[in-house]
């Protein structure tokens, strides 16, 4: 069980693990993000980069979120340990066809907290738009709950092969850029 009010935040879903944010919530948030991205991008199988920070709760939330994304038919592109900037850069560069990104992190908050923040690449401008839980995800969750679709999560298979190597690609791009600025 999780605190439904966390879906009313503007910028992210964030709370104390496991009392407020947990694997069940991460699964549903992953599902809602994938459904929102599919509709917004008019793409039934959007590719979504997923990263996580080094908090002890992040691997479990990461796995659940990836499964929630995969449950919709969207393609999760797991990149493992990363920074928010790396995930956003990957989406901006459309690595492996990615049009959205999700990061498991609670940023500057104490270690008992964790969170989920996400972005969608704006096809018209190329910029990244924040996916707001309150504005974009809560209504999707509520519709699923009303129809019974938001019952207990089921595990969905997802690619466990090599990840995006986001850290290496990000570092290489940064080094290339610094050489060109010299």
Residue ranges of each PLM-predicted region?
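Short, electropositive, low-hydrophobicity segments enriched in small/polar residues
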Residues: 16-19, 23, 55, 84, ...
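Gly/Ser/Thr-enriched, mixed-charge loops and adjacent short helices
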Residues: 114-182
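N-terminal small/polar loop signature for handling phosphorylated ligands or for N-terminal nucleophile
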Residues: 35, 43, 47-113
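An N-terminal, well-structured beta->alpha segment
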Residues: 1-67, 71-72, 163-182
């Amino acid at each position: 069980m999780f605190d439904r009010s966390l879906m009313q935040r503007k910028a992210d879903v964030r709370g104390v693990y496991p009392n407020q944010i947990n694997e069940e919530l991460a699964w549903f948030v992953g599902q809602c993000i994938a459904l929102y991205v599919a509709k917004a991008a008019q793409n039934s199988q959007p590719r979504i980069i997923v990263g996580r920070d080094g908090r002890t709760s992040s691997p479990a939330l990461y796995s659940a979120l990836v499964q929630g994304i995969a449950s919709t038919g969207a393609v999760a592109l797991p990149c493992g340990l990363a920074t928010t900037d790396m995930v956003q850069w990957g989406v901006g560069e459309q690595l492996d066809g990615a049009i959205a990104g999700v990061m498991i992190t609670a940023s500057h908050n104490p270690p008992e907290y964790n969170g989920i923040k996400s972005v969608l690449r704006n096809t018209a401008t190329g910029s990244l738009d924040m996916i707001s839980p309150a504005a974009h995800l809560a209504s999707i969750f509520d519709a699923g709950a009303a129809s019974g679709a938001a019952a207990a999560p089921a595990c969905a298979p997802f690619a466990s092969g090599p990840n995006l190597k986001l850290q290496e690609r990000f570092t290489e791009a940064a080094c290339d850029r610094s050489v060109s600025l010299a």
